[in-house]
UniProtKB/Swiss-Prot annotation:
This is Dynein light chain Tctex-type 3. Acts as one of several non-catalytic accessory components of the cytoplasmic dynein 1 complex that are thought to be involved in linking dynein to cargos and to adapter proteins that regulate dynein function. Cytoplasmic dynein 1 acts as a motor for the intracellular retrograde motility of vesicles and organelles along microtubules. Probably binds BUB3 as part of transport cargo. Required for the efficient progression through mitosis. Keywords: Cell cycle, Cell division, Centromere, Chromosome, Cytoplasm, Cytoskeleton, Dynein, Kinetochore, Microtubule, Mitosis, Motor protein, Nitration, Nucleus, Transport. The keyword Nucleus applies. The modification 3'-nitrotyrosine is found at residue 4. The keyword Ion transport does not apply. One of its GO terms (cellular component) is nucleus. One of its GO terms (biological process) is regulation of mitotic cell cycle. GO terms for molecular function: dynein intermediate chain binding.
Length: 116
């Protein structure tokens, strides 16, 4: 793994930065694809691994949890929820919703500050 330096003087999770990173990862994996059940495991694994790699490369003092769900688009919709008990001044979350004509994707990033 590449070396990086942590920026410990920064306070607070930058959800916009995380959103942009995750969106690029989703676009790179799912962009131009149609829903195919046989590819879901590979797609979701690629999205979470790439997102996590790029988040860690930021060098910030966080532990990250990244989840991804991809479902076939239907008239019934798709709903998710999450809840966290943490320090809202330093920890944070980001949810990215992505869709095309055949599928929906939801990625959640949970960032927990490492306090030394």
């Amino acid at each position: 793994m590449e070396e990086y330096h942590r920026h410990c003087d920064e306070v607070g999770f930058n959800a916009d930065e995380a959103h942009n990173i995750v969106k690029e990862c989703i676009d790179g994996v799912l962009g131009g694809e149609d829903y195919n059940q046989n590819n879901i495991n590979q797609w979701t694994a690629s999205i979470v691994e790439q997102s996590l790699t790029h988040l860690v490369k930021l060098g910030k003092a966080y532990k990250y949890i990244v989840t991804c769900a991809v479902v076939q688009r239907s008239a019934y919709g798709f709903h998710t929820a999450s809840s966290c008990f943490w320090d809202t001044t330093s920890d944070g979350t980001c949810t990215v919703r992505w869709e095309n004509r055949t599928m929906n994707c939801i990625v959640n990033v949970f960032a927990i500050a490492i306090v030394l």
